[in-house]
From Swiss-Prot:
Gene3D superfamilies: Cytochrome Bc1 Complex, Chain C (1.20.810.10). This is Cytochrome b. Its main location: mitochondrion. One of its GO terms (molecular function) is metal ion binding. It is a multi-pass membrane protein. Heme b b562 binds at residues 83, 182. Its cofactor is heme b. Belongs to the cytochrome b family. It comes from Cratogeomys castanops. InterPro entries: Cyt_b/b6_C, Cyt_b/b6_C_sf, Cyt_b/b6_N, Cytb/b6-like_sf, Cytochrome_b, Cytochrome_b_C_euk/bac, Cytochrome_b_N_euk/bac, Di-haem_cyt_TM. The cytochrome bc1 complex contains 11 subunits: 3 respiratory subunits (MT-CYB, CYC1 and UQCRFS1), 2 core proteins (UQCRC1 and UQCRC2) and 6 low-molecular weight proteins (UQCRH/QCR6, UQCRB/QCR7, UQCRQ/QCR8, UQCR10/QCR9, UQCR11/QCR10 and a cleavage product of UQCRFS1). This cytochrome bc1 complex then forms a dimer.
Length: 379
């Protein structure tokens, strides 16, 4: 008699994805972030659902409905702060997941990688429209500034902006549609995650050595379910510490002031996880050029499979490329810091140098390093 998980049509899918999945025996803790992203997504959907039950997407009542959630709804403050800080946690895991993909050459699985980039764009869009919903000062002005960037598109730019706004400024129509987008996008992300996993399981997971591991694969359960559970415990500990002790640490104090179109905040800036892209945008004094650099700063990831010149997949045994990788990580952290600073010397020049270095490392230095390493290994 066959085991039910191997014969039942639905359980068979789960079995092939999470139980009997052949997995490399040597994948490290850096591979935990995929499952942690799944946890973050579920956390965001559930907390978001409960927030949506009490939130009103109207300019007159949006701000006070968030206040009502925090003050009057049972554990509303906890749900709200879990949702707000859950977004930060999501992006921390996302950036580490992408970093691991770059370090270990996972981008050579082109379909999985490209769907991952699409997921990154959708997650950024979801986070942006979600940040507008509390209708505080930074919500309003952030929405105004970022949507206005589309006006840089020749010919159709201004019409496109007014179409997205639903009027001649960010107002009630904008808030209502942003709430609709914020509600539907996580479900689209969930569907794409399934496709992401489908393509990943077609090829099997990569490993730190970047070598084929078909001869020594182990079942996913119990080895990696246990390992992932350990990651979940650590992540939730960190997350609840942040939520319960430092809930406003990653937010902007300006968002505790209701939106006022007549009063501009001294420094308009997005949430911390967009600051690196915002710094790249600001480093170019031309509006269209800045917008193109902003989009390309993410799209450049799609070029990685075509810029891979090394005969080794992973960076594990490539000291020159490793050095460049960690300079790139430092550069992204520098850009994040610059994005939160005012536009004045010395921040302007630091931002410009860091932006040039970002593209220089990815597009030119990393491929050259791969060729040099091939030559040194006499390959």
């Amino acid at each position: 008699m066959t085991i039910m998980r191997k014969s039942h049509p639905l359980m068979k899918i789960v079995n092939h994805a999470f139980i009997d999945l052949p997995t490399p025996p040597n994948i490290s803790g850096w591979w935990n972030f995929g499952s942690l992203l799944g946890l973050c997504l579920m956390l965001q959907i559930f907390t978001g659902l409960f927030l949506a039950m009490h939130y009103t997407s109207d300019t007159m009542t949006a701000f006070s409905s968030v206040t009502h959630i925090c003050r009057d709804v049972n554990y509303g403050w906890l749900i709200r702060y879990m949702h707000a800080n859950g977004a930060s946690l999501f992006f921390i895991c996302l950036y580490i997941h992408i970093g691991r993909g770059i370090y270990y050459g996972s981008y050579l699985y082109k379909e999985t990688w490209n769907i991952g980039i699409l997921l990154l764009f959708l997650t950024m869009a979801t986070a942006f429209v979600g940040y507008v919903l509390p209708w505080g000062q930074m919500s309003f002005w952030g929405a105004t500034v970022i949507t206005n960037l589309l006006s840089a598109i020749p010919y159709i730019g201004q019409d496109l902006v007014e179409w997205i706004w639903g009027g001649f400024s960010v107002d009630k129509a904008t808030l209502t549609r942003f709430f609709a987008f914020h509600f539907i996008l996580p479900f689209i992300i969930t569907a794409l995650v399934m496709v992401h996993l489908l393509f990943l399981h077609e090829t099997g997971s990569n490993n730190p050595l970047g070598l084929p591991s078909d001869c020594g694969k182990v079942p996913f359960h119990p080895y990696y379910t246990t390992k992932d559970f350990m990651g979940v415990i650590l992540l939730l500990t960190l997350f609840m510490t942040l939520v319960l002790f430092f809930p406003d640490k990653l937010g902007d104090p300006d968002n505790y002031t209701p939106a006022n179109p007549l009063n501009t905040p001294p420094h308009i800036k997005p949430e911390w996880y967009f600051l690196f892209a915002y710094a790249i945008l600001r480093s170019i004094p031309n509006k269209l050029g800045g917008v193109m650099a902003l989009v390309f700063s993410i799209l450049v990831l799609a070029l990685l499979p075509y810029l891979h010149t090394s005969k080794q997949r992973s960076l594990s045994f490539r000291p020159l490329s490793q050095t460049l990788f960690w300079i790139l990580v430092s550069d992204v952290i520098t850009l994040t810091w610059i994005g939160g600073q005012p536009v004045e010397p010395p921040y302007i020049i630091i931002g410009q140098v860091a932006s040039v270095l970002y593209f220089l490392i990815i597009l030119i230095l990393m491929p050259i390093a791969g060729l040099i390493e091939n030559k040194k290994l006499k390959w």
